[in-house]
Amino acid sequence: MKKKIKIKLNGKIKTIDENSTLFNIIKIFKIPLQKVAIELNQEIVDKKKIKSINLKDNDKIESVHFIGGG
């Protein structure tokens, strides 16, 4: 049985597999990478590094949507 960890995704607590990457979570929860910036523990993540970031218990992930205006 895989060990589980808890993360907070856009303000909601989620239980995920311990060895999950940020990329896995983006795919599982269908976050549109083309339209958002990803923040991990209050820091913007370089999209080139998303596949190599392993998540830890209590990590906080936010998808920040771009809004046009003028």
Task: Map each language-model feature to its residues.
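Ubiquitin-like/PB1-type beta-grasp interaction modules and other compact soluble beta-rich domains
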Residues: 1-69
